Each structure stands twice: as C-alpha cells, then as structure tokens.
Regions:
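Active-site flanking residues adjacent to catalytic metal/cofactor-binding acidic residues
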Residues: 172, 245-247
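Rhodanese-like catalytic fold shared by cysteine-dependent sulfurtransferases
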Residues: 209-242, 250-285, 290-333
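Pocket-edge structural micro-motifs
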Residues: 7, 152, 246, 268, ...
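Feature for soluble, non-membrane regions of globular proteins
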Residues: 1-217
C-alpha cells in the first residue's frame, strides 16, 4: 500500500527561535516530496518484469532505500521537537537554562559517554562537522550491543543493523537556512532548546524493551472520527459530495491567502452561525492547520448535531505535503 503522509507531530508555532514558516516549509516541501517520490518509485518497481535491465532495478532499489530513510528520519525529527513549552524548571524534563539535559536522560547515556556533558559535546561537534554540507546526526541505540552512540547519516540510508535512532537532528541546509542562513551553530543551539525530551525518553524505553515504535501522530490520542489526507482525496475523486470545512483560526487565516481546493473557510468559534449552511445528508470533512485541537473540536460539535463528520489528520499542512490542490481564498483573490 502507498506510504501515507504522517501528521506533523509538533505545533510549529510553539517552537522557540525556529519560525513556523520554516518548519511548515520543511514539512510540506521536503518531507512531503520524500513521501511522494517514494510512492512513485514503488509504483515503478511494481511494473518491472524479467526484461528490466539489472542496473535499472538496482538504481530503483537504492532510491527506495534512501527515500524510506528520509521519510522515517523526517518523521522522527519533527517528533523530537516541541520541548520548549513542555519542559521547565519544575517538570523534571528540563532545566531553567534549557541547555542541561534531564536527569532521566543523563542516567541512560552516562555509561556509554562518561557524562551527559560529554555526550552533548560530541553530538554538537558531529553536527558542526556537517555545517555547509548535508546529513543527519543521530543518537542511536544498538539492541545487539546494548549501547548508545552518535552517528552521521549522509544519504538517509546509513542505518545500523538492529538499532534505533532516538534523537534526530536534520543538518541538511533546508532544515535551517531560511531562519539561520549559514549560521549552523546557532541552529544547533536552538535545536537543543526545543528538544522534546519526553518523546526521546519514550523512544528509549520502547527500543530497550523491544516494543513496537511509538505512534507520534497527535491525533492518535482522540477517538473522534477522522480520515487521512489520502482518504479525503479518494472521497473527492469518487464524487461522494463531501463538504470540506476549513476551520483554521481567524488569526491563522489572516496570515495565509490559500486553502484546500474545494473548501470553504468557517470560523471555528462561530459554528452556530454557519452550521445551517451545511447539507445534513452529505459527509463533512473538517481540517485545521496541523490536525490538533481546533478541527477535532469542530468535528465533535458537528457530530453532536447529527452530521457524518470527520476531521482531517494532519490538517491542511498534511494535504499540501501530499501534493493536494490548493486555491486562493475568495477574499484574497
């Protein structure tokens, strides 16, 4: 089955020193392109036969491997961001200066690095060695050797056997150039200020106990009916008459001129004023910016009023990342 777009696991507007614009561009363009290209490569692989030249098969399999790595590493990278608003002096997950690692993390890595400070110095130096170039820096845990180490992955596909990355830093220039230019050192420092240590510690526990990878999709915590952007695209293609509601907050809409093609913007704070404009016997798909609370809450209200409503996982950002069509808002056109 095709690789689906994973909803972004962090609220881009909550990061400290990293702009929402850069994170969204990274997600929609770079991550989205990796998913779309992976699906295209797999479609081509499915058409090959015994007459396919060996070099063509070899090239496609290498490309598939690299793209699989890019997709996974991007998802993990976004998933370990967002700690600035979660951690604090009294949370047990951070320190007042935002530069010390939490005690629980230090306890995990000290045996392999000597101290948390020594780990951080090596991780930072490794990242700085990639400045101006490209690649990933990973803190990886080897299940076979029962130890952590920092590694470089320069083409998305340099993964160790039976090992799992638990902290990921994207050092490709697209990850920081928009905000930091060539100042990779400032980006690395800002990255540390935004690490979601809670997510990192959960990954460590999952890996060490040989449990399946965590589902870091923010919509996985609700039982409100939902659909993926791929499922929404199928509904549209099948002519189901789905009504698409853009429920992004007014202040968010004031900064954007586009919306999903076929959608109508509705103020999420004034559902009672526009709900009568919907057709009761047709399905409704509701999306917000990134698939967190807003679209989910509007969907709950519509369901309570008898509508067959679902919220779109990942919001409009996931739709754009999938290559979905967009249109100008009527007021902006």
């Amino acid at each position: 089955m095709p690789q689906e777009i994973a909803p972004i696991a962090v609220r881009p507007s909550t990061l400290s020193g990293i702009s929402e614009q850069m994170v969204v561009s990274h997600y929609e363009n770079n991550y989205g392109n990796a998913v779309r290209t992976l699906n295209a490569v797999r479609r081509e692989l499915a058409t090959l036969d015994a007459g396919t030249p060996p070099h063509r098969l070899r090239g496609l399999k290498r490309e598939e491997h690299s793209l699989m790595g890019s997709v996974a590493l991007h998802e993990l990278y976004f998933g370990n961001l967002g700690g600035f608003r979660r951690a604090g002096p009294n949370s047990g997950l951070g320190r007042p200066d935002w530069h010390e690692v939490p005690d629980a993390f230090a306890a995990e890595i000290t045996a392999d690095f000597g101290s948390a400070s020594a780990w951080r110095r090596e991780f930072v130096r490794t990242a700085q060695s990639l400045a101006g170039g490209s690649g990933w820096v990973l803190l990886t845990y080897s299940r076979r050797q029962k130890r952590f180490w920092n590694q470089i992955a320069t083409d998305h596909s340099q993964a160790a056997v039976d090992a799992a990355p638990v902290l990921i830093l994207d050092m490709y220039e697209h990850a920081y150039h928009m905000d930091f230019g060539v100042n990779a050192a400032a980006y690395i420092d800002t990255f540390f200020r935004n690490i979601n240590w809670e997510a990192v510690l959960k990954r460590i526990a999952t890996t060490q106990n040989d449990r399946p990878p965590l589902n870091e999709d923010p919509s996985s915590t609700t039982d409100t009916p939902s659909l993926s952007v791929e499922e929404l695209a199928a509904h549209i293609a099948n002519g189901s008459g789905v009504q698409i509601v853009d429920a992004r907050q007014r202040d968010h809409m004031s900064r954007h001129v586009d919306l999903m093609a076929g959608a109508t913007w509705r103020d999420p704070d004034r559902v009672e004023e526009w709900i009568a404009e919907l057709t009761p016997d047709k399905p409704v798909a509701v999306y917000c910016a990134y698939g967190f609370d807003v679209g989910c809450n509007v969907t709950k209200t519509l369901i309570e009023r008898g509508f067959d409503a679902r919220f779109v996982r990942g919001g409009v950002a996931a739709w754009y990342a999938s290559g979905g069509a967009r249109a100008l808002r009527p007021t902006a056109g």
